[in-house]
C-alpha cells in the first residue's frame, strides 16, 4: 500500500508541475493576445484610409477606364490559388484543424483533380500538411512572429500578387481564422483578387470633385491597387495571428483547468488510500493484541 501511496503522490507532483507550465503559457498567450488585438485595431485605421482612397479614385465619369483595371476585372478561371494561414506550432486547440479541414472539403468540391488548385502557405503546420498529401505549396513562409510586421510578410505578399498579375492563377483567396473574441473565431475564405468588394458609390463626392492628379488616374491605380491588395492580405494575417494567440490562451487555460481536476481526483484517491492503509494497520494491531490475550 505504501508503494501505491508513493505512486499517487508522484502523479500529483507531476500534474502540479504540468499545471504550472500550462498556466505560465496561458499568461504568455494572454499578453500576446493583448498586443495582437491592439495591432489589429491600429491597422484597421490604415486599411480604411487606403480603401477610401481607392474608392474615391474609382468614382466618377473620369474613372470609367480605370474601373477596367486588370486587378478589378474577373477573367476566365483556369486556376485558383489559396493563401492558407496556420500556426507554426501546436498547442492551439482546433485552430489549425478547422482551416485545413474546410480547405480540403473545398478542394474536393471545386477542384477534385487538383490541377486547377494552388496553395500558398503561411505557417509550418499548413505547409507540412499539404506536403504530406502530395500538394506542393507554390510559396511558403515559416516562423512568423506573433505580431508580424509588414516587412516580415512583404515578400510573400508581393510575390503572390505578382503571380496573379502574371496570370499564373486567375483568382486568389485567403483562408484564415477571423478573431471574434478570446473564446471564438470564425473560419473565413475571402477573395482577394480580383478585387470585387469596392463600390465607387461609397466615394466622397466633394472630395472626388476637388481631386487634382499630377499623374494619370491609371498610373496612380497601377501603384495603389497592389498596395490595397497587400493591405487586405496583411490585414488577414494580423487577424489570423490574433485568433491564434486567443486559441493558444484558451487551450492552455483548458489544460490548466483539466490539470487542477486531475489533482483534485488524485488527492481524493490518495486520501482514501491513506485512510485504507491506516485502517489496515489498526486492524492488524488489534488482531495482534487479541492474539496475545
UniProtKB/Swiss-Prot annotation:
PROSITE patterns: ATPASE_GAMMA (PS00153). It is found in: Cell membrane. GO terms for biological process: proton motive force-driven plasma membrane ATP synthesis. The keyword Ion transport applies. It is a peripheral membrane protein. It holds the Pfam family ATP-synt. Its main location: membrane. F-type ATPases have 2 components, CF(1) - the catalytic core - and CF(0) - the membrane proton channel. CF(1) has five subunits: alpha(3), beta(3), gamma(1), delta(1), epsilon(1). CF(0) has three main subunits: a, b and c. This is ATP synthase gamma chain. The gene is atpG.
Amino acid at each position: 500500500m505504501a508503494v501505491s501511496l508513493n505512486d499517487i503522490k508522484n502523479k500529483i507532483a507531476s500534474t502540479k508541475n504540468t499545471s504550472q507550465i500550462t498556466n505560465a503559457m496561458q499568461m504568455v498567450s494572454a499578453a500576446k493576445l493583448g498586443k495582437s488585438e491592439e495591432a489589429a485595431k491600429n491597422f484597421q485605421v490604415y486599411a480604411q484610409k487606403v480603401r477610401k482612397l481607392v474608392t474615391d479614385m474609382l468614382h466618377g465619369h473620369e474613372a470609367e477606364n480605370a474601373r477596367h483595371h486588370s486587378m478589378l476585372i474577373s477573367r476566365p478561371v483556369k486556376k485558383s490559388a489559396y493563401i492558407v494561414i496556420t500556426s507554426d506550432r501546436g498547442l492551439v486547440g482546433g485552430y489549425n484543424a478547422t482551416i485545413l479541414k474546410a480547405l480540403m472539403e473545398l478542394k474536393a468540391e471545386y477542384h477534385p483533380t487538383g490541377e486547377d488548385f494552388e496553395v500558398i502557405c503561411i505557417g509550418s503546420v499548413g505547409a507540412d500538411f499539404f506536403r504530406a498529401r502530395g500538394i506542393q505549396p507554390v510559396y511558403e513562409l515559416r516562423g512568423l512572429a506573433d505580431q508580424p510586421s509588414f516587412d516580415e510578410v512583404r515578400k510573400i505578399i508581393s510575390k503572390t500578387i505578382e503571380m496573379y498579375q502574371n496570370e499564373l492563377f486567375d483568382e486568389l483567396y485567403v483562408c484564415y481564422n477571423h478573431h471574434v473574441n478570446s473564446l471564438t473565431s470564425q473560419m473565413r475564405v475571402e477573395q482577394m483578387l480580383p478585387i470585387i468588394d469596392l463600390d465607387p458609390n461609397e466615394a466622397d463626392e466633394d472630395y472626388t470633385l476637388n481631386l487634382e492628379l499630377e499623374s494619370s488616374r491609371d498610373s496612380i491605380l497601377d501603384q495603389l491597387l497592389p498596395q490595397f491588395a497587400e493591405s487586405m492580405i496583411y490585414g488577414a494575417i494580423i487577424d489570423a495571428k490574433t485568433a491564434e494567440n486567443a486559441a493558444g490562451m484558451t487551450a492552455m487555460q483548458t489544460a490548466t483547468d483539466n490539470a487542477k481536476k486531475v489533482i483534485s481526483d488524485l488527492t481524493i484517491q490518495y486520501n482514501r488510500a491513506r485512510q485504507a492503509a491506516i485502517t489496515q494497520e489498526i486492524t492488524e494491531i488489534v488482531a495482534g493484541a487479541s492474539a496475545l490475550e
